[in-house]
Amino acid sequence: MDKILEAVVTSSYPVSVKQGLVRRVLEAARQPLEREQCLALLALGARLYVGGAEELPRRVGCQLLHVAGRHHPDVFAEFFSARRVLRLLQGGAGPPGPRALACVQLGLQLLPEGPAADEVFALLRREVLRTVCERPGPAACAQVARLLARHPRCVPDGPHRLLFCQQLVRCLGRFRCPAEGEEGAVEFLEQAQQVSGLLAQLWRAQPAAILPCLKELFAVISCAEEEPPSSALASVVQHLPLELMDGVVRNLSNDDSVTDSQMLTAISRMIDWVSWPLGKNIDKWIIALLKGLAAVKKFSILIEVSLTKIEKVFSKLLYPIVRGAALSVLKYMLLTFQHSHEAFHLLLPHIPPMVASLVKEDSNSGTSCLEQLAELVHCMVFRFPGFPDLYEPVMEAIKDLHVPNEDRIKQLLGQDAWTSQKSELAGFYPRLMAKSDTGKIGLINLGNTCYVNSILQALFMASDFRHCVLRLTENNSQPLMTKLQWLFGFLEHSQRPAISPENFLSASWTPWFSPGTQQDCSEYLKYLLDRLHEEEKTGTRICQKLKQSSSPSPPEEPPAPSSTSVEKMFGGKIVTRICCLCCLNVSSREEAFTDLSLAFPPPERCRRRRLGSVMRPTEDITARELPPPTSAQGPGRVGPRRQRKHCITEDTPPTSLYIEGLDSKEAGGQSSQEERIEREEEGKEERTEKEEVGEEEESTRGEGEREKEEEVEEEEEKVEKETEKEAEQEKEEDSLGAGTHPDAAIPSGERTCGSEGSRSVLDLVNYFLSPEKLTAENRYYCESCASLQDAEKVVELSQGPCYLILTLLRFSFDLRTMRRRKILDDVSIPLLLRLPLAGGRGQAYDLCSVVVHSGVSSESGHYYCYAREGAARPAASLGTADRPEPENQWYLFNDTRVSFSSFESVSNVTSFFPKDTAYVLFYRQRPREGPEAELGSSRVRTEPTLHKDLMEAISKDNILYLQEQEKEARSRAAYISALPTSPHWGRGFDEDKDEDEGSPGGCNPAGGNGGDFHRLVF
């Protein structure tokens, strides 16, 4: 029968005839047969199935095996012995073909259980291991995977299983797509997926095999062979548990046995896996490894791989199936390559055609990719400005796409930079500390120079002034301003966690200061602003003279001198009027100022509540102007009339002295308070005008005005009750003992008044603007009277500055003790301050910086600075407490240490640390509402373009810093491997050395961080 069937199959009969004859033979084979006849049919079936050149013989062979196996199981068990299986697998040279493996799989399906089956499975466990060690092709390897997936008893056991998994990884690395075209590619992908699926199945059964397989995978991709391994290895990544990622990357990046060339080769080949269409989580592993390399400061590898692979990754955005992974890797590579524009500029020629292709695609995936690509381009243009000729085609291509705001751009640039990655060695070696999570850069303390650092950070955070300095065109006539520009440029764009202001400090040194000793930061600020102002004036005059001397035309009338940068940003004007009380003659003098020095009222004024500092609870009412006084007020009550300018002459109309603010103790509701205050500003100004008219026509008041007077009395009574209640509570606290009172903890300082008279900045400003009697030894020389006379001096603000600087005069000379002392009173700081200007106008100011002095003497202690971006934005968009807007995000600058903070911390610093008191305050003028204000705000928020020399210097220093960090990491890596995970002696490098003294800051050469940083000196 077997001879007949073989002759039919090999004959030249038509296929239909052959099929009919085959059916008859198969029907006969279902009947009882002799053993020899059945074995002959089985041998023919195996021969046709494995060696058939056409489809019909293979199908006939398969049918024969099925029929014989089902109807003659005993004979089939005898035929499908271990010897027969071994002959099938070793029948040819090299690894067995996929048909032989398929025949074995078919035989296993038909093989009955028994000793013969056990012997076959034992043989197959050895043979499949031998097979994968011979590196079969994708088809045979996929057949092995199908065989083992269907018959798990064939999987090698014991130690051979791990070896089998590792050899499967090696096989995947040798895969090559055998056919061209879509069908061949799809088949190749399916084969790779089957093999990787088998690996995943084995890993689930034996998780301990995962890490050795990963080690084998790295050995494959890091070997510098002539022929790179197949991208089919990417199919393995999708089955790796993400929980292992951090540990694997950390161990790999810190492994001393892995050379740089191996790591470079491995990461380069992993990035090529982005083109693998079915790879899940490939981008996550690539990014994790890049972050791991950044953490151990292997920047040379990162630079090389970024420059060689970024264009290839970018090209994959064309293909939707791999677009997501490619875009993730591209974003990370660009956003981390911030030390130089080289990587971004490699992509510039490719961006416009890519945008055109994505627009033409018109799909959800393409649209999303376009938006993210445009955002990425805007970030890079923001980071590397100054190349308009290169950027113009790119900006033209994305002009119709969404433009991210500056806050979003800074957020993206700040979160992924290489220098922001946490170093594995940072806990032991502070030189490797990463850039602050805030994205801000600290200043190194050069030995009691915290007073300089605090002022410089406050000036830098005044965004309008910073932009003005950065926009300065390089001018040899302004050397100090140029040095400040370079300092600000590095604070804005450096990758270092902290830089040294040594060069700028030496140029701006105050002559009467002693080097190495603590100085008054307010005194330094005044000197610095004056130097900058005079330098710019002198430079402008020199330029004008040079221009006139070089002009052939007759000299024209010199133009009026323009305002300097200091005048524009910090300059205001104040009018002082002195009225002789004898002849009522008034002398006026207008002066320019850059800061206001606010003295503390004498102790007897502590209990008095001036109108501007009277605050109601936030939930009841915000600070607002009260109506005019009534005649019913007794002598013991401080009425609103006392808060108004006295009418000196008819030419000097009265000016209201109200000051509005948000009490710092109510910081939790700061956003809602600002919104309510802004909504009431317009109404307040109208009420001010009405009050002044009402005061001049006091005799004609009607019934409605008397009702207002009653409201005033009720409001003042409430305030007095609140004051009495606070006093009672503080008396109860005092009764607990002197040791529990804050005053008792600071014997070396002095307080001018108790907590009953707790002050606000509003009180100090009111005291500054209140009329002053010039009597006795302080009498005024009146030119009209030609003699010394009693007089009254009144101070008014005639023009408010863009940035209002307030200095609280805490240091005074005590004639009794003959030494300088510090006033340690806690002064509450309003977030929003409204100052009166001459003519009845008012101007709102937002708090943006607070310089704090820690200590009891001006000759000692420490300075640090709280600040936020001094950029204007309507109060309604200040954000929430959980997620503040960037303009509402406070930072603490403590020399090299920069951290996130809050207005609540600013408000409560003195209550927690009684020696730490606010000293210098920066307020930014709030623009008036309307279209002009919005245009002005957007203009101010545009980041300036740095000139070429400065950008090149920053880029070179960033590269130098990366090299320094890499060198330092390499020199330390050999030691860190032998250290315990969390040694006690390794803690505290990033802690403040002065915290045990009850202060948030320390004054040591490394500043609040106490670390030894690589120092960039200007």
From Swiss-Prot:
EC code(s) of this entry: 3.4.19.12
Catalytic center residues: 450 (nucleophile), 862 (proton acceptor)
Keywords in alphabetical order: Cytoplasm, Hydrolase, Mitochondrion, Phosphoprotein, Protease, Thiol protease, Ubl conjugation, Ubl conjugation pathway
Residue ranges constituting the USP domain according to the UniProt record: 441-926
Biological processes annotated in GO: protein deubiquitination; proteolysis; regulation of protein stability
First-tier enzyme category under EC: hydrolase
UniProt PTM comment: Ubiquitinated by CHIP/STUB1 in an HSP90-dependent manner; leading to proteasomal degradation. This ubiquitination can be reversed through auto-deubiquitinating activity.
Feature: compositional bias, Pro residues: 552-561
GO MF terms, alphabetically ordered: cysteine-type deubiquitinase activity
Record field: compositional bias (Basic and acidic residues): 673-691, 699-709, 718-728
Gly residues bias (residue ranges): 999-1011
Reactions mediated catalytically: Thiol-dependent hydrolysis of ester, thioester, amide, peptide and isopeptide bonds formed by the C-terminal Gly of ubiquitin (a 76-residue protein attached to proteins as an intracellular targeting signal)
Summary of the tissues where the protein is detected: Expressed in testis, pancreas and skeletal muscle.
SUPFAM superfamilies (UniProt xref): ARM repeat, Cysteine proteinases
Subunit structure: Homodimer (via C-terminal region). Interacts with HSP90AA1.
The protein's role, per its UniProt record: Deubiquitinase that plays a role in different processes including cell cycle regulation, mitophagy or endoplasmic reticulum stress. Inhibits TNFalpha-induced NF-kappa-B activation through stabilizing TNIP2 protein via deubiquitination. Plays an essential role during mitosis by deubiquitinating and thereby regulating the levels of Aurora B/AURKB protein. In addition, regulates the protein levels of other key component of the chromosomal passenger complex (CPC) such as survivin/BIRC5 or Borealin/CDCA8 by enhancing their stability.
Name of the featured protein: Ubiquitin carboxyl-terminal hydrolase 35
Lineage: Eukaryota, Metazoa, Chordata, Craniata, Vertebrata
Gene transcribed to yield this protein: USP35
